[in-house]
């Protein structure tokens, strides 16, 4: 065969006559220059001298925060001080102690350049002083001892002896005490090991060295400086100050007598939620004319002139391009008696999880409905978001509702159309659990701004409507009772990296209060950290309380371990995390009966977690809560039941009886909400 002939006729001599050396390259035959060798070739003989790297110690950060608190600065000045310190540490590193940097910043009135110049000049003078002292001490040594005895010290090393130093009242072995020439760097004295003859000569020479260096470095300098730097007095003092704060009095002082209220705007997609609230913010003066003019021009170029006011709250390019709100937009405005935190929730069915996140943080709600013919019916009938949003906010604890009947100008402010909408909606909201006294209907027009911040003067409306405008109705809402006396709880809604050290989280404080310098515990990661700064409505503050939407700057923890949905609490009274819990659920309008092993999506605060219904324990009476049936085979629409759920990952939960805000959740399946529930018992 042909392939056999190729093998038998192969000339192997051609392979053996190959003169190429494959073990080295062609260039290795030539000499390499010393400069090239020094630049590109590694020599094992010349071992680089590696200096010991100082470990990051959290106590240093704690001491720096304590030193800042000793100066009793205001919240704004403290934020400026932290900013200056971060800038100076980027240039100087950790070579200069925080106390020196703080004194320099305060002395130069927060001018970073002057403070840096002062610190560098101080270090230069100190280094010259140390150099002069070193030459004087070596001169004294040369006089007190012959040169031969000094050179003979390099023959063998001195045997070190263990030195014990007292730190914070406890005796600990800190290192070795070696006789040698003492020197000073940055205010800390230390001993340098030197070589010398056997022990007898070493002791004799060390006596001379000690007498020579007595004036420059006393023998107890290390111990004294360590005791002074490790004194925990600032920590105790700051703790006492935190305990003495009267949170209720500070709340009144901070708000100027105005009460805080968290408002969420909900409704069917394209009902005009963003336009309505954006126009209200513009009329209140929160948006200046220049910015509004820019939005008008940009929306005209995009072919969406009517979306100009919506762009006040829809800030991302994708939201503006698609013309729908996708994430919860947050801003602040004030009424006569309230400070309102406004949350504009998305209305599209695909973004219901984001809407649940916003509704879970709200105290009251504004439900926006479209008064146009056919549009209201599309949003209110089966498949529309008006019904689902109403059920969601009621299930998440919202009891006060203002219904803004929007786009009334398109139906010429007809009283019949307004009464038709209020009749249908009023009946549904009453079934959902809202009291008639807590629901108000206001005719509005988001595009023209009619009946938003002032009562309408249009004759078509005033001839049959004599009620409040939308802003007056929002101002008349009653704020809920804040849980300031309960342990601290904050649910994370966003995590991001800050420019300085540490990272930032945002969220609403559900209970308790917090101050800068406090220690926090994150659950379920079970990691601790320290609050470096607090920001409320883009302004740095010293503390925040329940109901506030804040941004916290945290240090002492890795950002990778924190996710959206984590809950921060006090280390003394932590929140529990579990994967199995029992709950009482109310089932909505569902097509498929719920059975054992039914998969659901659990929405809790800002968490969205897959879960499974492990057990159907009993069916309960809606009004009395009594057990009507034990161990049911399935659950259908409208039933109230006790079930056991299991999640894939641990979730930090609270019992509904202890924390109502943190005891509610929603269950969704197949893109629709199927049940609302409250936590009754945690299993594991």
UniProtKB/Swiss-Prot annotation:
Region spans: G5: 445-447
Region span, G4: 406-409
Pfam families, sorted: GTP-eEF1A_C, GTP_EFTU, GTP_EFTU_D2, HBS1_N
SUPFAM superfamilies, per the entry: EF-Tu/eEF-1alpha/eIF2-gamma C-terminal domain, HBS1-like domain, P-loop containing nucleoside triphosphate hydrolases, Translation proteins
Top-level enzyme category: hydrolase
Positions with biased composition (Polar residues): 212-232
Gene3D superfamilies recorded: DNA helicase RuvA subunit, C-terminal domain, P-loop containing nucleotide triphosphate hydrolases, Translation factors
Gene Ontology CC terms, in alphabetical order: cytosolic ribosome; Dom34-Hbs1 complex
Major site of localization recorded for this protein: cytoplasm
Catalytic activity: GTP + H2O = GDP + phosphate + H(+)
GO molecular function, one term: GTP binding
Chain positions with Phosphothreonine modification: 231
Residue numbers spanned by region G2: 323-327
UniProt keyword list: Acetylation, Cytoplasm, Elongation factor, GTP-binding, Hydrolase, Nucleotide-binding, Phosphoprotein, Protein biosynthesis, Translation regulation
Compartment annotation: Cytoplasm
EC number: 3.6.5.-
Disordered: region residues: 130-241
PROSITE patterns referenced in this protein's UniProt entry, alphabetically: G_TR_2 (PS51722)
Task of the protein: GTPase component of the Pelota-HBS1L complex, a complex that recognizes stalled ribosomes and triggers the No-Go Decay (NGD) pathway. The Pelota-HBS1L complex recognizes ribosomes stalled at the 3' end of an mRNA and engages stalled ribosomes by destabilizing mRNA in the mRNA channel. Following mRNA extraction from stalled ribosomes by the SKI complex, the Pelota-HBS1L complex promotes recruitment of ABCE1, which drives the disassembly of stalled ribosomes, followed by degradation of damaged mRNAs as part of the NGD pathway.
Quaternary structure annotation from Swiss-Prot or TrEMBL: Component of the Pelota-HBS1L complex, also named Dom34-Hbs1 complex, composed of PELO and HBS1L. Interacts with the SKI complex.
Name by which UniProt lists this protein: HBS1-like protein
Species this protein is from: Pongo abelii (Sumatran orangutan)
